[in-house]
């Protein structure tokens, strides 16, 4: 298999930037979820020193705005999965199993296990019970049988995450991925009901409400690994009303760094975890030598 030219990914990002600046998209900046955008930019910029040249850039299929209803009626929490809940499973680019739900919004799972009661910020964060990664909007999104979610509204807002570190981590990745890849009407619902937006972050949220899905409408072909299962997760700060969650994705570089991480702030408001939309200039990404120890654990 031929080795892909890393400059192609940089070129795609440059073309998108040029299009946004010329008015091809609404607004002067088009903000994706920080969960994915930081990793996209970091990996595209750093890809020139990668050594793994055989990863596919084929994009998983995406659902469009016409695939889902737009009202906010929640799913009823399930006690038993329907027989046709899932189609044929797939894998991400690293071979991790990903289920294919027949519901394009994702399939909530029966909550059959008590949530974790671990709240030590320095403790290793084990995955929730019954963790399942599902392909939703072409991305990989986590569900569990212990820490939620317990419902998803028909306009794509997940709820019912446990008031635990695992619940915060599940909510962070769920909300971030949905805000990145979902149709724009669902982006708006997520930001209205599952996010906290400061005055400084409002321009970023406005762009995401109206432009989120448009960046991929032209099929720019960003690397497929942007939709992968995170290689490791950790929580560095946790209290009853706040959690700082970090996710890592792998890199192969000549200087010893093996991954790039991004941090996400979550707050507990109104009985649910909500994503704190980052303000402009906030860059919580960093390079990692290892995702072994130091609180990191694979999920």
Regions found by a protein language model. Give the residues of each.
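Structured, amphipathic secondary-structure segments that form assembly/contact surfaces
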Residues: 3-9, 184-272, 277-298
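C-terminal region of N-terminal signal peptides and the immediate post-cleavage residues
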Residues: 42-62
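Short extracytoplasmic/periplasmic juxtamembrane "stem" segments immediately C-terminal to an N-terminal membrane anchor
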Residues: 58-75
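Core segments of small alpha/beta cavity-forming domains
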Residues: 139-213
């Amino acid at each position: 298999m031929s080795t892909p030219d890393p400059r192609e990914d940089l070129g795609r990002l440059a073309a998108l930037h040029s299009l946004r600046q010329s008015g091809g998209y609404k607004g002067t900046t088009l903000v994706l979820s920080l969960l994915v955008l930081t990793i996209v930019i970091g990996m595209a910029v750093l890809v020139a020193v990668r050594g793994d040249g055989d990863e596919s850039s084929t994009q998983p299929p995406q659902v469009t705005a016409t695939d889902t209803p737009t009202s906010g009626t929640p799913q009823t929490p399930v006690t038993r999965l329907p027989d046709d809940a899932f189609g044929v499973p797939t894998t991400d680019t690293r071979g991790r199993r990903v289920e294919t739900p027949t519901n394009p919004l994702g399939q909530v799972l029966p909550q059959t296990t008590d949530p974790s009661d671990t709240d030590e910020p320095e403790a290793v964060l084990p995955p929730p019970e019954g963790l399942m990664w599902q392909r939703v909007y072409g991305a990989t999104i986590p569900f569990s049988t212990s820490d939620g979610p317990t419902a998803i509204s028909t306009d794509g807002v997940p709820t019912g995450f446990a008031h635990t570190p695992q619940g915060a981590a599940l909510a962070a990745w769920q909300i971030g991925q949905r805000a990145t890849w979902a149709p724009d009407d669902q982006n708006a619902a997520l930001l209205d009901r599952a996010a906290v937006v400061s005055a400084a972050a409002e321009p970023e949220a406005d762009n995401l409400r109206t432009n989120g899905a448009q960046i991929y409408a032209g099929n720019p072909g960003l690397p497929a690994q942007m939709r992968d299962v995170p290689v490791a997760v950790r929580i560095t700060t946790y209290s009853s009303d706040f959690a700082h969650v970090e996710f890592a994705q792998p890199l192969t570089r000549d200087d010893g760094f093996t991954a790039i991480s991004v941090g996400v702030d979550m707050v507990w408001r109104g009985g649910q975890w909500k994503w704190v939309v980052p303000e402009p200039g906030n860059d919580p990404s960093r390079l990692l030598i290892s995702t072994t120890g130091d609180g990191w654990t694979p999920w």
